[in-house]
Every structure is written in C-alpha cells, then in structure tokens.
C-alpha cells in the first residue's frame, strides 16, 4: 500500500523541462565539459573568445624567445635520450618483488615524467620560438594543457604515495595498506582518476610565450572574467605539505631506529632507495611550492618563468639522479652506451669499387 502511494506521488511530481537525458547532445553535459569540448574544436566560448583579433594580431601579443626555445627543446630531447634507457634498465634488470617492489612505483613515475617532457619542455620550446599564445593555437594549447595537468597531478601525487609506501614499509603496523601489488595498483588507479577529474572539471593551464609559463588566464583581454583552479591550488598545497612531512618522518625513523638486518649491503641498499625517493620528492615539492606562491602572493613577472623552469626540470632531473645515485642503474646505463657504440663501430661499410665491393669493419 505504501509502495503504491509512493509511486503515485512520483507520477504527480512535475518533471522540469530543463532536465536533459540525451547524452549525444553537448548541452546535456556539465558546463565544464561543454567548455572543454568547444575549446578542443577551436570554437569561441564566453570565457575563451578569440574573435576580437586576427591570428596575426594575436601573435603580436606573444613574444618570440629563440634562446629559451632552444633550451627547452634541447633539454627536453636530452631528457628523452637518457630517460628511456633508465626506464628500460629498471624494467629489464630489476626484480620488482618483495623488497624491490618500490621500484614499480618509481617506474610508474618515470613513465609519467618521460611523457610529460613533451608537454612541459619540448612543446613550450616551440611556443617560445614562434611566440605562441592561446588564441594562435587554441586546440593544441588546450590538449597540451589538459594532458600536462593530468601528468603533473598524477606524478606529484604518485611521488607522495611513494613516500607513503616507504613509510608503511618501515612502520610494520601500516604495511598491510601496500603489501601487495594489487593494493599498490589500486592506489595508483585511484590517483589516476583523481588527476583526470582535476583536469576535466577545472580551468586548464595554457602556456604563454610572453610569461614563459603555463597560466590559467588565456590573456584574451576580457574584463571581469575570473579564471581559477581551486583543485590545483589545494592539490599543490597538500602535495608539498605531504612530501615534506612524509620524508621528514622517514628520515627521523631512519636515524632513530636500528635496522633489523645484519647485512651492511642491505642497509646501504635501503639508504639508497630512501635517498632516491627524497630526490624525486624534491623535484615535485619545489615546483608545487612555487605554484602555490604564484596563487597567494603578488609576484614579479620573472617568477612565473622561474617556477616553470622548476616544473620543466621535474620531468628530467630524476633520471639524472637515478644514474648518479643508483650504482646498478649507472652501470647498466653505461653498459647500454658501450653496446650502442660497439654496434656502431661494428657496422659493415660497403664501398663500391668498379664491379666489386669491399667490406670494411670499423673496429
């Protein structure tokens, strides 16, 4: 009887005509997704309207910086050159089980960083060379902005999780949170969806050649429009604070407790992992702090570029740190270089001489 009355009540409720159920219609999606879809098709919106100037006029609002462009592109390609071999060494030469399963997270972060370099180093280099702004290439700017935001949020939160993972390993009562690969994978999956949410439903960052930094404001000259990203603001605060606190706790625990091992080699190994983790965390903590500073303090124009340099280096410095701090990575990396050089020298040069050929080995 109660169920029948409830159904009658639902039937009598007037359905608002504003409710939209057709997911094929863009207007039925949230406003944030509608705006992103229009930006990805280079269509003007109320907040991202490029109709006020021609493309050549928009180029005049940017600034060509050949020197910085060369730096960004060359450093990005250099990071790619050393980054992929380091990741290859981790994947093929390290047994990522038991004590070494922390390397799974390092490889995950490394894959984020090596792909992020294209968006935070190589692409800004071309933007600097040609003096690009949002309205000169709205589609590309939006795609790169959304992608780099996902990569930054995912990479920095994964770095915080790396510290949390090490802390759980040292505090045995918390080890159950991360003691299986399934649990670790679940944590990283949650962080991935968290990063995608922040990128889709909040204002994106758009690289500007005048400021040489990613900005929320597209610099289209519209008055009274507010561009903000509270998600990114609080994320950077939380990540910076978490990284500092977690690794401070790790260092305190390391210095105060006795290691439950009689092997000096294992002790050095654990110290090496901790040092590598701290270095990775610093490459994320410093840009996060600088980004927060940009939000809360009036800063000079040059500080935008300095902040972006710290962000740009966060994608490549960890690979240099791995080579310098991890003996096995360094040895395997140098071995790969020797193999490549030996392969080049052993190539056969075929020199045509009349009707015959001579094969020469360049050894």
From Swiss-Prot:
Pfam families: 7TM_GPCR_Srt (PF10321). It comes from the Eukaryota. The keyword RNA-binding does not apply. The chain crosses the membrane at residues 70-90, 107-127, 143-163, 187-207, 231-251, 278-298, 303-323. The keyword Glycosyltransferase does not apply. It is a multi-pass membrane protein. Keywords: Membrane, Receptor, Signal, Transmembrane, Transmembrane helix. Residues 1-18 form the signal peptide. It is found in: Membrane. GO terms for cellular component: membrane. Belongs to the nematode receptor-like protein srt family. This is Serpentine receptor class T-55. It comes from Caenorhabditis elegans. The gene is srt-55.
